[in-house]
Amino acid sequence: HAPNALVLTVAKGETARTATPLRAVTLTCAPTPGGTHPAPEAACAELRAVDGRFSALRGDQDRACIKIYDPLVVTAEGVWEGQRVRYERTFGNSCTLQTEAGPVFSF
């Protein structure tokens, strides 16, 4: 198995550089799901389904969200299938984060 080791964060703000970190977890997916992530099996399954492409993650698309702007920024840094990854995305609020990113950033 190629190495998979990630640090995932959720922060309050518009960019990772200026945001206030709220939560951080570790996630490993090989040889078995683990780390401090509360649901590593679901998160790893979701990442495998999109070949590790964080931008392709899809959460609960049927969920309706209110339009209050309270931005959260998520980051992922580490190694996926032996390749370095660095990902950052800002969501309008916690509801859109869960709707669009799913179990990977549910912590």
UniProtKB/Swiss-Prot annotation:
This protein's record includes keyword Lyase: no
Gene3D superfamilies: Subtilisin inhibitor-like
The keyword Secreted appears for this protein: yes
Main subcellular localisation: secreted
GO MF annotation list: serine-type endopeptidase inhibitor activity
GO cellular component: extracellular region
Site (described: Reactive bond): 67-68
Keywords attached to this entry: Disulfide bond, Protease inhibitor, Secreted, Serine protease inhibitor
Signal peptide boundaries: none
Cystine bridges: 29-44, 65-95
Intracellular or extracellular location(s): Secreted
Matching Pfam families: SSI (PF00720)
Free-text function comment from the UniProt entry: Strong inhibitory activity toward subtilisin BPN' and, to a lesser extent, toward trypsin.
HAMAP family for the chain: SSI
Subunit structure: Homodimer.
Family stated for the protein in its record: Belongs to the protease inhibitor I16 (SSI) family.
Name listed for the protein in its UniProt record: Subtilisin inhibitor-like protein 5
Gene source species: Streptomyces fradiae (Streptomyces roseoflavus)
Taxonomic lineage: Bacteria, Bacillati, Actinomycetota, Actinomycetes, Kitasatosporales
